[in-house]
């Protein structure tokens, strides 16, 4: 019988896997801190190391299962959460090619550029997505275009960190609406990009 639920949270400072019973009681938790590395070429950058951080995330899952001695077959569902506005870019084959944490601050010039291009755009995007430029993906994607054109040209898909966790667990890259809207690219009313 499936008597447990698992949550995997990709937070700003750490990743954790938490196991609950069906009444919501916490049965076990495993957590690992991760770091976001500044690229010395780009002050304010906070790169996300998806290879190493996947080792940490999957290690949390293994650890909580080992500590609680719960058979994975007894888990009814897994949910993921994350730091909002941390983004990953993928190539056409679904490979991660670039990622940054939500605290990445390298796109200040791009925010200014967007405001110069269209002073009303931020308000228009806010009305549709509920997001401003502050931590939004649009200035970061523009930053990649301006500073890493080879990565920009290879980019076929974008996702947030909990989407990445789901992708790593299932092989399916999908974005759920509440997180997709944090990109500033999803209209919450129409659920269209």
What does each model-identified segment do?
Residues 92-95, 113, 117-119:
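Hydrophobic or amphipathic alpha-helical targeting/insertion segments
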Residues 38-41, 109-114, 185-188:
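Short, charged, surface-exposed secondary-structure boundary motifs
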Residues 107, 115, 125:
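Gly/Ser-rich phosphate-binding catalytic loop and adjacent alpha/beta segment
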Residues 35-45, 120-125, 174-181:
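Gly-rich Lys/Arg/Thr-decorated short loops/hinges at beta-loop-alpha junctions or inter-strand turns
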Residues 1-99, 154:
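N-terminal glycine/serine-rich phosphate-binding loop of ATP-dependent small-molecule kinases
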Residues 10-12, 23, 99, 124-193:
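Gly/Ser/Thr-rich active-site cleft segment
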Residues 104:
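Carbohydrate-associated surface elements
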Residues 54-58, 62, 108, 112, ...:
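Generic alpha-helical structural signal
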């Amino acid at each position: 019988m499936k008597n447990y639920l698992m949550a995997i949270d990709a937070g700003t400072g750490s990743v954790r896997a938490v196991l609950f019973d069906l009444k919501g009681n916490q049965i076990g938790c495993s957590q690992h801190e991760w770091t976001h590395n500044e690229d010395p070429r780009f002050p304010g950058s906070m790169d996300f190391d998806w290879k190493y951080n996947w080792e940490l995330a999957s290690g949390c899952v293994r650890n909580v299962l080992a500590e609680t001695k719960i058979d994975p077959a007894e888990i009814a569902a897994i949910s993921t959460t994350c730091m909002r506005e941390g983004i990953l870019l993928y190539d056409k084959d679904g490979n991660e090619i670039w990622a940054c944490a939500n605290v990445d601050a390298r796109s200040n010039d791009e925010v200014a550029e967007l405001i110069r291009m269209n002073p009303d755009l931020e308000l228009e995007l806010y009305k549709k997505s509920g997001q401003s430029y502050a931590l939004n993906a649009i200035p970061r994607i523009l930053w990649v275009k301006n500073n890493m054109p080879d990565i920009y040209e290879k980019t076929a898909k974008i996702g947030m960190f909990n989407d990445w966790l789901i992708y790593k667990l299932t092989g399916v890259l999908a974005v759920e609406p509440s997180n997709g809207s944090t990109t500033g690219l999803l209209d919450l009313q129409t659920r269209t990009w």
